[in-house]
């Protein structure tokens, strides 16, 4: 995690309000403010595994990773500090799930960059709480409100489904390509025009669409899917189940929990961390790929054409090839030497 974000710097302008309170941090947490702030107690819920890895070093069991927080974890908290994500639907999903395990009257602080859509917070509350803006700085806004009544949350009501070829894709809010297959993934899938065998790893799997489409076409292909996002993990499991496909779905920070070696590693890797551009995950994906490929195994990824991956592929593998491209995207392939 990086230095404090602008959103956290806005929170710190109000630090005196938190010193005697029991805080719950949640949402799009991009730094370690929760480990530094002065409060009676601090707990953190995150659905991002790599952020949880950073937080548990200091917070231990007071940091929780998962799709939704459990009531036993939030018990005793009297103040919620929520970081607004870039997806409004994800914010609605997360806030409703949090409100369902928090007491009526709890203090709620919602902070986010203005470009994230945080200023529409009141319109998305469905009467659960009323907010007023209490600060604006660093191109961020901070809102305060209180939970006005008990809230019910049914996860089954939040699923979305669509089809790609003959594959059913199930998604939750906050997962990449939640409503339809993105152009980059479609280009990547188009390059697999021959039968596949062996085992395949789909990194940053999102809703599992890449692995599911390839697994449906190649029944002998052994599938492993990984992501850092708890919503992506749940979505991928649901996608495999809907298509009667077997596969291992692993929460992993790139290769952190991946032990096997593969014939194929595929990915449409992210290049954003929240609203910021970040190439760290893809850098790790490429650099460490030879350690997780069998001799002759292939890494095949799709990326925006302007991103600086060719030199890194050559440095790591010795060479690479571009096997498909449009004006916006390129599909790169590199092979581990025997």
Swiss-Prot record:
**One Gene Ontology molecular-function label:** nucleic acid binding
The GO cellular component terms are:
cytoplasm
- EC assignment: 2.1.1.172
> Primary place of residence?
cytoplasm
Top-level EC class: transferase
Q: Which reaction(s) does the protein catalyse, per the Swiss-Prot or TrEMBL entry?
A: guanosine(1207) in 16S rRNA + S-adenosyl-L-methionine = N(2)-methylguanosine(1207) in 16S rRNA + S-adenosyl-L-homocysteine + H(+)
* Gene3D superfamilies with a match to the protein in the record: Vaccinia Virus protein VP39
Q: Where in the cell is it found?
A: Cytoplasm
> Could you list the residue ranges forming a coiled coil in this record?
none
Ordered alphabetically, the record's keywords are: Cytoplasm, Methyltransferase, rRNA processing, S-adenosyl-L-methionine, Transferase
Q: Check the record and name the Pfam families matching this protein.
A: MTS, MTS_N
> Has UniProt tagged this entry with the keyword Ion transport?
no
Q: Which family does it belong to?
A: Belongs to the methyltransferase superfamily. RsmC family.
Q: What does this protein do?
A: Specifically methylates the guanine in position 1207 of 16S rRNA in the 30S particle.
State whether it acts alone or in a complex, and with which partners, per the record. Answer: Monomer.
PANTHER family, per database record: RIBOSOMAL RNA SMALL SUBUNIT METHYLTRANSFERASE C (PTHR47816:SF4)
Q: What protein does this entry describe?
A: Ribosomal RNA small subunit methyltransferase C
What organism is the protein native to?
Photorhabdus laumondii subsp. laumondii (strain DSM 15139 / CIP 105565 / TT01)
What's the gene? rsmC
